[in-house]
Each structure stands twice: as C-alpha cells, then as structure tokens.
Amino acid sequence: MRIEEDLKLGFKDVLFRPKRSTLKSRSQLSLTRQFTFKHTQTQWQGVPVIAANMDTVGSFAMARTLAGFEMMTAVHKHYSLEQWQAFVNSTDPTLLGHVMVSTGTSEDDFTKTRQILAMSTALRFICVDVANGYSQHFVEFLRKIREACPNHVILAGNVVTGEMVEELILSGADIVKVGIGPGSVCTTRVKTGVGYPQLSAIIECADAAHGLGGQIVGDGGCTCPGDVAKAFGGGADFVMLGGMLAAHEECGGEVVDVDGTPFMKFYGMSSSSAMDKHAGGVADYRASEGKTVLLPYRGPVENTVRDILGGVRSTCTYVGASQLKELTKRTTFIRVREQENNVYGKE
C-alpha cells in the first residue's frame, strides 16, 4: 500500500486566469479543429464535442442534429442491425462521418460491430467502451479489433492514468477515453472507492497521449459550458457529454408526467435501470454503479448546444485564444475555493 501526496483537481477547483486578447468579437473565433489519427493517418475536421454513448443520449436523432453543428455522436450499442440499416439508408454519408459505432468487448459485440461497419464506408469511427479500461481482456479485444479494422479510427476507454493511455494507444487506439466516476449519474466512486478527479486525469492523460501522437476524450464531469472549456484547457482533444445533453427531444428517453410537468428519465449505463433493460437485471455478482433520475424535459437540443459552444468561444476570448486549438496553450488555471455567487440560486 502507498499514498500519493499530490493533490488532484476537478473542474470545481479551478478557474481560468484571464489574459490580454487581440480578438474584437467571439464571432472571429473558430471551434473547428482538424486531427490526423495515429494508426490510420486519416483526418477529421469538426467541432470536437461528442454526445455520449448512453441510450438516453447517443441516439440517431441526436447524431442528425449534432452533425449540423459539426459535432460527433457516439451512437449507443443497443440499436439492432435493422435499425442501423434504416439509419444508414436514410442518412447522407457526410453526416455518417460524424458518427461513432459503439461496442462492448464480447464476441457478439465484435461480430455486430463489423456488420454495422460493412453497411457504409462513411462509418469511420469505432467507440470501444467499458467501465474499466485496465483489464487485460479489454487490451486484447482492442488489439483484435484494430487488426480486423485497420482503416477505422478507434476510440477506447475508460482510463485515468498516463501509463494506461500509453498501453491503449500502443495496442491500437487512436483516441483514449478518460474518466472513471465523474459522470452525473455514475456512482462508481461511491460503490467502489475508485476514481480520479477529472481535470487532473485529463492533464496527465493528455500529456501521455500527445507524446505518442494520440488524442484523448475527456468523458464525464462537465456540468456547465465552463467545465467543457476547462477540459479543453487541460489538454483534452475532444470532450464527451452525457448529462448536459440529456432530457432533450432527440434523446429518445422515457417521458414521465409529474403533476402536469414533463420529465425525462436519465440513467447511467451501469445502473439497475440500464441492466434491467438490456441485461435482464443486475447480475448476482455485481452492484449497480449508476443512478436513475428524472430531469425536466428541455425541448430541442440545439439551444443547449449553442449555449455550450457560445460559452467555449467566450472562454477563448477571455484568454486570448483565436482558435480552439490554442486554448490549452493560453491556459493558466488558478486554484479557487469558490466558483460563482449563488445568492439568487445556481445558473
């Protein structure tokens, strides 16, 4: 046993230090980035924000809407092959370039993923998603899918430390998903005592990935546009959002009427709700590591997206970054004990 004495930080522990800027307006600023991926040497250009591969967020409808903002959607793995075929047949190939096909690590998942990818050459991205990216089985599956899909960009996770980021990149991942326990409907840290404050995880994992020519996704922990900006400032190449995009028209979640007010059900993918729906219940050997909440129905997602992107643009102008790529180079975080004035309630 040993204890690491270094203090690890989350988004709530810091603020950006403002700096001189030559920008006259937020409208001068571009959030579009272009990436070249390590293993395929292919390129992608767009706004590097991804809707999470949760079945109450990463829907086909969400993918269609977010593609209009040049953003990405990691479509959840629970759609059938028939549903995928209908989506591909009715969707422009350009839009499919903003879609990730999500998969688990079972043999059935592997077979299904290859069948989906065969539907269109425009489906370029694979999201290999497990709660614990530290298992040897996960690494072996990653090598297997890299060998089977040499021309596809692979996103894999989740992990929170540099040495495992390096392991995944060397095993075939182009992008590594970073985050254990920070999500709004995740209870892993409570049930297991395992986790890592998200900002420190991003900073350390970005350093490891960039040294090998890979990228990272900051997955989880963002509660407001300022947190999204902090993730980018800490070195994340992409940011994945679940709760911030939940309870919208495009989510496809269950709408519940409470005293005449519509709410939408939102739950973690390791919650009892998810396991009841997709696995026939919580297995005897495990505990639920997610919760189920009712969120006020928020209508179309486009207004929320504009608010998020507008906040990140504003951050860039405050620190003098003329494009999103420059944000991490212009970032100085200050440690704080307060974030905002809540005398009249939270924003």
Curated annotation (Swiss-Prot):
Its EC number is 1.7.1.7. One of its GO terms (cellular component) is GMP reductase complex. GO terms for biological process: purine nucleotide metabolic process. Keywords: Metal-binding, NADP, Oxidoreductase, Potassium. It is an enzyme of class 1 (oxidoreductase). K(+) binds at residues 181, 183. It catalyses: IMP + NH4(+) + NADP(+) = GMP + NADPH + 2 H(+). GO terms for molecular function: GMP reductase activity; metal ion binding. Pfam families: IMPDH. The active site is at 186 (thioimidate intermediate). NADP(+) binds at residues 108-131, 216-239. The keyword Protein biosynthesis does not apply. Belongs to the IMPDH/GMPR family. GuaC type 1 subfamily. NCBIfam families: GMP_reduct_1 (TIGR01305), PRK05096.1 (NF003470). Homotetramer. Catalyzes the irreversible NADPH-dependent deamination of GMP to IMP. It functions in the conversion of nucleobase, nucleoside and nucleotide derivatives of G to A nucleotides, and in maintaining the intracellular balance of A and G nucleotides. This is GMP reductase. The gene is guaC.
